[in-house]
Swiss-Prot record:
The active site is at residue 515. Its EC number is 4.2.1.9. The lineage of its organism: Bacteria, Pseudomonadati, Pseudomonadota, Gammaproteobacteria, Cellvibrionales. This is Dihydroxy-acid dehydratase. It comes from Cellvibrio japonicus (strain Ueda107) (Pseudomonas fluorescens subsp. cellulosa). Keywords: 2Fe-2S, Amino-acid biosynthesis, Branched-chain amino acid biosynthesis, Iron, Iron-sulfur, Lyase, Magnesium, Metal-binding.
Amino acid sequence: MPVYRSKTTTSGRNMAGARALWRATGMKDEDFQKPIIAVANSFTQFVPGHVHLKDLGQLVAREIEKAGGVAKEFNTIAVDDGIAMGHDGMLYSLPSRDIIADSVEYMVNAHCADALVCISNCDKITPGMLMAAMRLNIPVIFVSGGPMEAGKTRLAEHKLDLVDAIVIGTDKNASDEQVEAYERSACPTCGSCSGMFTANSMNCLTEALGLSLPGNGSLLATHADREQLFLEAGRRIVEITKRYYEQDDASVLPRAIATFEAFENAMALDIAMGGSTNTILHLLAAAQEGGVPFTMTDIDRLSRKVPQLCKVAPNTQKYHMEDVHRAGGVVGILAELNRGGLLHNQVPTVHSKTLQEGLDQWDIISTGSDAVATFYRAGPAGIPTQVAFSQATRWPTLDADRVEGCIRSVEHAYSKEGGLAVLRGNIALDGCVVKTSGVDESIWVFEGPAYVVESQDQAVKDILDGKVKAGDVVVIRYEGPRGGPGMQEMLYPTSYLKSQGLGKACALLTDGRFSGGTSGLSIGHVSPEAAAGGAIGLVETGDIIHIDIPNRSINVKLSNQELAERRDAMAAKGNKAWKPIEARPRKVSASLKAYAMLATSADKGAVRDLSKLD
């Protein structure tokens, strides 16, 4: 029988000092016989997806205490990728994932907590906490802050999101009135950005991994129903904690729930819903933390057989996360995958013995439950607010149309090709990724001359200066985990290509990554990265690059001998090899240099290569 970890600090005469300190936090005699459950909150006033979380940690804590546990809340950092975008602030985004993972580990292990509730929401916070959960392998449950409502303005016929504001800001044909209207309307409420961007993609994937409750990824931050997710998380964590420590039930541990099969389920969901390419990076990292042998090869295999069943902004202007929820949420997509034989349905979850049991209870198509139908009719109020649970609007009906609705059946899929693909070739020997759901099918096969730049900043300048022409393949290199360092997101270059009318006329290739808000022929995560000796560092302006999504290939039209000669020439540069030709006006702090020293390329999840420490 496992011993409560907290007994290390709460039992025995020699722990009198530790107990004295615990008492100073408010613990009573009876509390030393209860499980101590850490509540990792990520409240910050910097991030709209987290601005409403301040009181929610204590909401969960009170419910934990009602259920017989002792709750201890702490905070992690949270970076807003949208605010950090387009300047050197983005260098810190991906490294913050590892800092979050480490900080959760430090707090939980330093204080010998028995279990963990992760209150996350945005881009690197959910992945960082997921990495920590897999690393710690103690009972855990995730509950996110929820998605933002989509924006509306009389100057647009469609609902708005952050990407619309970015694109129109550099559209020379847009009036100042339009730009201001979009800016004021694109992000109307608290919550993670309203499309299937990285934050919402990751919160959806925690459902597929079995580590969060139904609705976690899709129920709006503003809706009153979301309060119940937080309360249930508090009750549920006490239940599964006691099952582990008092009944020796290891099936409730993260590594028993988020198995290889669960990671395959999460990736199948990601492909089916056309999620952010960042999710690939984060799933690979989390799998490594848990010792799960899930790799790019598995992602490639799944991408060839899982169809696209859901299309959400930025891949369409028609649907946002509020529409996904109305159509049955993540469970709705998983249920369609299950009916198509594309799911491992016997894996456990934190809320049901098996995933199949959870689908039977929560799928709007098959359950017949009025309570479930009411839950998924939770909708937007259209009132700007930064307050959680502040409205109780409901759609008059569900979207149960699996032929032409937001979520479709396998038989009526948006496309037989899934929403994500892994490409390989002489320019990306270890692979690169593209969000096919955001690429017009007319350019799935594309060939053009390389336009090589060695920083995102230069790419942005050249695009806005009109130097990039239709037919070009913009190559942005030395922006990988090591080369950036920090693997910046390229939302601005892709958005500016759109604003210049080049969204369907150019491709963009990088060893950096893309925001979940990116669409277009944007190929990222090129591995190995340039700074690690990848062939992308050998490409020259004018080289012809051939991209073939259906055949999963990407190549620069150079012979092996030509590439070898260029590699020899690069090696001859000595300590200047595999670095930008010209020094970049970029301030790289000591902490970023430390990150770069250990960072692996994207195909490994951009995790730290700890073998370098041996």
